[in-house]
Amino acid sequence: MNKKEVISYSGFSMMPPESVELLENNKGRVVINENEKIVDVPDYKILSFWDRIEQLGIWKWKKKYNSKYEILDGYQWQLKLRNRKGEAKHIEGHESYPKNFKDLIKELNILFGTKIEF
């Protein structure tokens, strides 16, 4: 039995939050600059995304990435993943990132047709 897939990312700083989320029936919710839209997410893109997640080693990322300095503002982000096999990961950070974080953002942009900047 396949588990419900979860692909959810949100990030924010001083600007309104940006977020993407996989919904049921190959749809995705994109919220950029307080504008929400529903987009089509073809199955082949979802499968390709999971391949890239594996290649990038995201399953091995730590659960938390926080700056060693106390920062009152700054960029905060959260990633929630669960693939069709049931593998799951919840990761969050505040002004600290894994080394290939930009690659994750690139893959999310490909999957959802967005232009999240980092």
Regions found by a protein language model. Name each.
Residues N26, I53-E54:
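Short amphipathic alpha-helical segments, especially helix-boundary/capping motifs
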Residues S19-I38:
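Short, flexible N-terminal segments of the mature chain
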Residues M1-F12, K37-S48, R52-I53, W59-F118:
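Short, well-ordered, aromatic-rich surface patches in folded extracellular/luminal domains
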Residues F12-E18:
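Short, thiol/selenol-centered motifs that function as redox-active sites or metal-ligating centers
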